[in-house]
Amino acid sequence: MNIVILAAGTGKRMRSALPKVLHPLAGRPLLSHVIDTARTLQPSRLVVVVGHGAEQVQAAVAAPDVQFAVQAEQLGTGHAVRQALPLLDPAQPTLVLYGDVPLTRASTLQRLVDAARDGRYGILTVTLDDPTGYGRIVRDASGFVTRIVEQKDASPEELKIAEINTGIIVTPTAQLSMWLGALKNENAQGEYYLTDVVELAIEAGFEVVTSQPDEEWETLGVNSKAQLAELERIHQRNVADALLVDGVTLADPARVDVRGTLRCGRDVSIDVNCVFEGNVTLADNVTIGANCVIRNASVGAGTRIDAFTHIDGAELGANTVIGPYARLRPGAQLADEAHVGNFVEVKNAVIGHGSKANHLTYIGDADIGARVNIGAGTITCNYDGANKFRTVIEDDVFVGSDTQLVAPVRVGRGVTIAAGTTIWKDVAEGVLALNEKTQTAKSGYVRPVKKKS
């Protein structure tokens, strides 16, 4: 089977410099959703027709299995499909999809393909309560499809028809070439409509069959930011429903966004307003607090992530405790039972088993052993303005509050670092490290007093 995806439109109503098919739905371009669905049907040829912003669109979705045809002038859907003909296998049927219709299920498309076997012409239709703006399916007294009429060209009687054309078709490819060549642009838009091919198919004696999706939203397209927002909500609710079926507890299914792939174990609980981006894995018994953003991360079993935590490119072991208001940046690796608390930032660092950094700390480019306590206000000074250096803290170290570790530096096993210490040299095992300071008390000091107005 050939699959052609039309993605050449200008998308004027989007009011954006970004080509319409590249606007994101669930964090990925609209067109990428359509291509992924097309791939599940295992086509022999997959062709995307580009036009407006062609180079940008091609760069965004380029892949070994995707070919591109260019529609230099926007002369209608029939003209667009004609540009793809040289890339198609004439011996195989062709399925035509749209780059701005991202939610059509593969099962719906397969049903249409099956209905159109043996050289039939298949149309995906849907019956709407309000069909305004769509091409109507015109049938004869026996119920056979005779033609498709566009909204602007429809008679008052035809405008009453509720069954509409979605634009998605399956057609014999060899005949399609002839039919597209016979199209005329004698319509209100002066365009070559792909929908006019159905009349040519009927005239040629081909049987025209129809199929409908399980859900109306499968055929919804995007022509404005409002429609994009509507489809985003539909998609996210579908994702939430699937998570609920899999046993995930969602505090409010309407307030979770998955912009990638979220894999959950048993008894996972997710509070409101959480966003998951890229590839995220949550093992069994993970609890996510409200307003968290988690991107490209793996979270071990029994972990608790408290509210307002941001995690990006991190690996968390089992039974870790994160947040609230913590930030784990790319390269953060936490072993089992590690704690990273409020207003702690970890970047490109390993935190060992049972180690804790509970408050107001920056840990960057560091290797921290097991059972280490990092006091509040500790900073690893890893950057000299040109280069990054690592800090190594071995097992069972106690780091007092307000400590600075100037990398590159190593702190040996079992060291205790006094509060307010700056470490710029390696520290041997088991010692107390501190900066000698003299505390002075001055008598007779009078604190300034505000003047009364």
UniProtKB/Swiss-Prot annotation:
Its EC number is 2.7.7.23, 2.3.1.157. It is found in: Cytoplasm. The active site is at residue 359. Residues 1-225 are annotated as: Pyrophosphorylase. GO terms for cellular component: cytoplasm; membrane. Acetyl-CoA binds at residues 376, 382-383, 401, 419. Residues 247-453 are annotated as: N-acetyltransferase. Keywords: Acyltransferase, Cell shape, Cell wall biogenesis/degradation, Cytoplasm, Magnesium, Metal-binding, Multifunctional enzyme, Nucleotidyltransferase, Peptidoglycan synthesis, Repeat, Transferase. Pfam families: Hexapep (PF00132), NTP_transf_3 (PF12804). It catalyses: alpha-D-glucosamine 1-phosphate + acetyl-CoA = N-acetyl-alpha-D-glucosamine 1-phosphate + CoA + H(+); N-acetyl-alpha-D-glucosamine 1-phosphate + UTP + H(+) = UDP-N-acetyl-alpha-D-glucosamine + diphosphate. Binds 1 Mg(2+) ion per subunit. Pathway: Nucleotide-sugar biosynthesis; UDP-N-acetyl-alpha-D-glucosamine biosynthesis; N-acetyl-alpha-D-glucosamine 1-phosphate from alpha-D-glucosamine 6-phosphate (route II): step 2/2; Nucleotide-sugar biosynthesis; UDP-N-acetyl-alpha-D-glucosamine biosynthesis; UDP-N-acetyl-alpha-D-glucosamine from N-acetyl-alpha-D-glucosamine 1-phosphate: step 1/1; Bacterial outer membrane biogenesis; LPS lipid A biosynthesis. Homotrimer. Catalyzes the last two sequential reactions in the de novo biosynthetic pathway for UDP-N-acetylglucosamine (UDP-GlcNAc). The C-terminal domain catalyzes the transfer of acetyl group from acetyl coenzyme A to glucosamine-1-phosphate (GlcN-1-P) to produce N-acetylglucosamine-1-phosphate (GlcNAc-1-P), which is converted into UDP-GlcNAc by the transfer of uridine 5-monophosphate (from uridine 5-triphosphate), a reaction catalyzed by the N-terminal domain. This is Bifunctional protein GlmU. It comes from Burkholderia orbicola (strain MC0-3). The gene is glmU.
